[in-house]
Amino acid sequence: MTIFDNYEVWFVIGSQHLYGPEALRQVTKHAEHVVNSLNAEAKLPCKLVLKPLGTTPDEITHICRDANYDDKCAGLVVWLHTFSPAKMWINGLTILNKPLLQFHTQYNAALPWDSIDMDFMNLNQTAHGGREFGFIGARMRQQHSVVTGHWQDKEAHQRIGGWMRQAVSKQDTRHLKVCRFGDNMREVAVTDGDKVAAQIKFGFSVNTWAVGDLVQVVNSISDGDISALVDEYESSYRLTPAAQVHGEKRQNVLDAARIELGMKRFLEQGGFHAFTTTFEDLHGLKQLPGLAVQRLMQQGYGFAGEGDWKTAALLRIMKVMSTGLQGGTSFMEDYTYHFDNGNDLVLGSHMLEVCPTIATAEKPILDVQPLGIGGKADPARLIFNTQTGPAIVASLIDLGDRFRLLVNTIETVPTPHDLPKLPVANALWKAQPDLRTASEAWIIAGGAHHTVFSHALNLDDMRQFAELHNIELTVIDNDTRLPSFKDALRWNEVYYSSKR
């Protein structure tokens, strides 16, 4: 059972009565076959549900209105099987507030060269029916996606599946509640921002709860529940001697388990799926939540440190998008550099809170080590290296008049040496196109020091996300050159200023 099981995507066929009842019967038969086959064979994350043909303005408007009010409907996939005059779609598309994709396909893959006639031509008109539909989308300035390809094509399946992930993520984001335990780290700029503007743009709400409210729940956890969770720790991780039974830091592990259970109960009771903490506001907690946060991220919660609600929300959004995909997604921070004559590297980490979904197959180490900030007891944490391979880091920032999403494509590499004195999980990567260009572009564009790191998602996923939410996207990849990058920032400033 995943979040995608809570949603469905409606499959809508556009046509008209011009071609007669027999043509419409064939259209319906084709649609049923296509939808049944896609549900059975395409490995789509969501179920497709075939809706009645849209052949009149009233029928189309009714479908769009129903989609808006059906909480299970994540979006509409439209196939223009025949020509469907686009003025019929205006009223429906005007009110539609769910994601929209045109599947530009046709029932037959190959033309029947020897038998093709005008009946066949009239029945299979995606080639120009889709263009008519595309015009009205452009004329109405309506955000929509297009996937071209035969309905049996695996690449088309993957692209539709990727769009479905975006559609479900958008619906989930509309209901997302972000809990901030305490406020921002004092005097930090990029983690602040306009929470009202964010709720208007994305739909998620952000509110602050006193750490004392959390502490009450943490203190209510029973010893039996703590013991059961620590047993899970024992089977899942390699505990250091200090963290084992009779170890000098065993109580710190028990305290971490209590915090994890209390945080999870608090989040569940409040309906929160993302949260932040700050080491400057820990009154009543015995340690900075480290292990608790790592394990909650692994369960799908969004998180960021120091009150960074934008990154916490983005992490939750990206975790929903990547559910079921290979590779993990985590809170991350660019921490320090390794300069090496063109083989420059970034070491990413945080004080404690890196998600185990990005770890290698080796069991993480559970250890308790001192933490120089926060003024609390030594916190428990998981220590691991990350998987290697292509990845991205993404940052969502508030520019005052708009939100900007920055994405840098990276290559995660093996750590060339052991790090015996570094008691935190970490990732090592090469920024693309190179560290100098990537870091300068990131800084010029205002990217945060906190990011969401993902092996599961790629640049195309984040581009779709930005388009679906109508926000600015700034890309740093192997094609990035600083002069043209700076030009693009200037053009974006003019473009988005004109839309105020």
Curated annotation (Swiss-Prot):
Q: Which reaction does it catalyse?
A: beta-L-arabinopyranose = L-ribulose
Whether Metal-binding counts among this entry's keywords is: yes
List the InterPro entries.
Ara_Isoase_C, AraA_central, AraA_N, AraA_N_sf, Fuc/Ara_isomerase_C, Fucose_isomerase_N/cen_sf, Lara_isomerase
One of the entry's Gene Ontology molecular-function terms is: L-arabinose isomerase activity
Q: How is the cofactor bound?
A: Binds 1 Mn(2+) ion per subunit.
Which positions are annotated as binding Mn(2+)?
Answer: E306, E333, H350, H450
- Record keywords: Arabinose catabolism, Carbohydrate metabolism, Isomerase, Manganese, Metal-binding
One of its GO biological process terms is: L-arabinose catabolic process to xylulose 5-phosphate
Q: Which Pfam families match?
A: AraA_central, AraA_N, Arabinose_Iso_C
| Cofactor field | Mn(2+)
Q: Can the keyword Transcription be found in this entry's annotation?
A: no
**What is the enzyme's class at the highest EC level?**
isomerase
Cystine pairs annotated here are none
Top-level taxon: Bacteria
Q: Name one GO cellular component term.
A: cytosol
Enzyme Commission (EC) number: 5.3.1.4
Instruction: Give the pathway listed in the UniProt entry for this protein.
Output: Carbohydrate degradation; L-arabinose degradation via L-ribulose; D-xylulose 5-phosphate from L-arabinose (bacterial route): step 1/3
Q: Which HAMAP family match?
A: Arabinose_Isome (MF_00519)
Q: What does this protein do?
A: Catalyzes the conversion of L-arabinose to L-ribulose.
Q: How does it assemble?
A: Homohexamer.
Family note: Belongs to the arabinose isomerase family.
Stated name of the protein: L-arabinose isomerase
According to its UniProt entry, this protein's organism is Klebsiella pneumoniae (strain 342)
